[in-house]
């Protein structure tokens, strides 16, 4: 945390400052570079895994940008009790990717068509978002149950689950498996090229180059794919010039079993939002305790929930505040929430043009896989850092070991608990839910006094891992 505190003292534009237009524009573009790839990637991954049409995937990407713009506008402007009033940027929540793929794949194997799959996934996301809205009013109680150990396990399980998706894309994706080209030299070569470029730029001293490493790696991989004839532009031919958000475009359907899974992920992601908003307040030189802090926290989580309601209605995956932008604030020294207005407007404008979303659907799976395999592994590492924030004593070790064992075990064979009632099985067949719920249960059951010496001597915080 010392680095964050130090960065806060070097702000060029503080929270309520109004930078000149050209400086606000530069700051906005810098933030967009940090979030653009992670923002559109979830829709691309879900679209590829469920083999959605190019038009549907492009629409998901466009709506992700528009919803992110609306959410960012709400967060930075703070209307009444809604919004943090900080430079909190909204983007698609990676926590839902594996859940959406699992639920959608199950429906697909049962013979459901694309429109019904989308209506169901977005329907349960719409209803589930109200859980986040309600959670904003009971944050002190949730924080007692969902501790850093619990939230760290959830983040770790998300990363570990996504690695499988990343490595499949690395080999060419699900389409390549169907065509028999999975893991050929072209796919592996392009994926490896992207991975090497991303690693190389992440070793640079320049924060700007490190931040843009993934985008640069994707560009290099895309150019290589063009040269190898791996890019197909046919999906862009019939796209309209402008896309207008169409509420419940695919209809509305609801499954209680799916809601249990999605609702659990929503509740577990609340603490992630709390951490992100706290970090944003810290780097913006605002209080991280007291009445102002609690008010911003409540407003930020409330906005998270309302924005996910809007996002699900127009056709986007659920949203959350993005941690990457805290690094941009530190790097640029610009914490002005008025820069957030510029970012919000730019995102909405970009989302209105489906050709932009359509272009991203032409990126070969191997290109995405090369970057995403590393990114998802870093998510897992972030989970480990959260787990050891307050040390890893014997009580926490038992919670982590049991949760990790059951969560990973379920990912290896999801049918192990099939004997359970359907309403319970639908929860525990998902590794993220299985690991997260186990952690919550053990955190409640195991006595708080069961705390002996640190199992990892000398490690008392995540900072000591640096």
UniProtKB/Swiss-Prot annotation:
Pfam families annotated for this entry?
Xan_ur_permease
Q: Keyword Cell inner membrane on this protein?
A: yes
Where is the site described as Essential for purine uptake found in this chain?
A: 272, 304
Effect on the protein of changing residue 425 to C:
Strong decrease in activity
- PROSITE patterns xrefs: XANTH_URACIL_PERMASE (PS01116)
Signal peptide positions are none
Phenotypic consequence of residue 232 to E = Highly active
Q: Name its cellular compartments.
A: Cell inner membrane
Which reactions is this enzyme annotated as catalysing?
A: xanthine(in) + H(+)(in) = xanthine(out) + H(+)(out)
What the protein does comes down to: Specific, proton motive force-dependent high-affinity transporter for xanthine.
- Provide the protein name: Xanthine permease XanQ
The organism is: Escherichia coli (strain K12)
């Amino acid at each position: 945390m010392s680095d964050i505190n130090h960065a806060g003292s070097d702000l060029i534009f503080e929270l309520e400052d109004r930078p000149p237009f050209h400086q606000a524009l530069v700051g906005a573009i810098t933030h967009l570079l940090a979030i653009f790839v992670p923002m559109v990637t979830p829709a691309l991954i879900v679209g590829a895994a469920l083999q959605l049409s190019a038009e549907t995937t492009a629409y998901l990407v466009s709506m992700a940008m528009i919803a992110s713009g609306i959410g960012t506008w709400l967060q930075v402007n703070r209307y009444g009790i809604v919004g943090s009033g900080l430079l909190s940027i909204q983007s698609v929540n990676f926590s839902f990717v594996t859940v959406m793929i699992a639920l959608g794949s199950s429906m697909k194997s049962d013979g459901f068509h694309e429109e019904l799959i989308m209506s169901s996934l977005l329907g349960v996301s719409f209803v589930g978002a109200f859980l986040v809205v309600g959670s904003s009013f009971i944050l002190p109680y949730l924080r007692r149950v969902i501790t850093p150990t619990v939230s760290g396990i959830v983040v770790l399980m998300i990363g570990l689950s996504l690695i499988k998706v990343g490595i499949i894309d690395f080999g060419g994706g699900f389409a390549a498996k169907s065509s028999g080209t999975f893991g050929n030299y072209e796919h592996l070569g392009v994926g490896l090229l992207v991975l090497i470029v991303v690693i190389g730029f992440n070793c640079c001293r320049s924060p700007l180059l490190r931040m843009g490493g993934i985008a640069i790696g994707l560009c290099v991989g895309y150019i290589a794919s063009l040269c190898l004839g791996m890019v197909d532009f046919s999906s862009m031919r019939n796209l309209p010039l402008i896309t207008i958000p169409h509420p419940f475009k695919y209809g509305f359907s609801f499954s209680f079993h799916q809601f249990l899974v999605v609702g659990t992920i929503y509740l577990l992601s609340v603490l992630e939002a709390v951490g992100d908003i706290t970090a944003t307040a810290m780097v913006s030189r605002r209080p991280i305790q007291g009445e102002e802090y609690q008010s911003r926290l409540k407003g930020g989580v409330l906005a998270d929930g309302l924005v996910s309601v809007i996002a699900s209605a127009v056709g986007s995956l659920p949203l959350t505040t993005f941690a990457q932008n805290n690094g941009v604030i530190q790097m640029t020294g610009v914490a002005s929430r008025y820069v957030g207005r510029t970012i919000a407007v730019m995102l909405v404008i970009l989302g209105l043009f489906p050709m932009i979303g359509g272009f991203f659907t032409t990126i070969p799976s191997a290109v995405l896989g090369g970057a995403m395999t590393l990114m998802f592994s870093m998510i897992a590492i972030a989970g480990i850092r959260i787990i050891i924030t307050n040390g890893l004593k014997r009580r926490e070790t038992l919670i982590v070991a049991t949760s990790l064992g059951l969560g990973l075990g379920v990912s290896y064979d999801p049918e192990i608990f099939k004997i359970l009632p359907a309403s319970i099985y639908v929860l525990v067949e998902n590794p993220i839910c299985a690991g997260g719920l186990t952690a919550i249960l053990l955190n409640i059951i195991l006595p708080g006094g069961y705390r002996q010496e640190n199992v990892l001597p000398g490690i008392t915080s995540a900072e000591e891992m640096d």
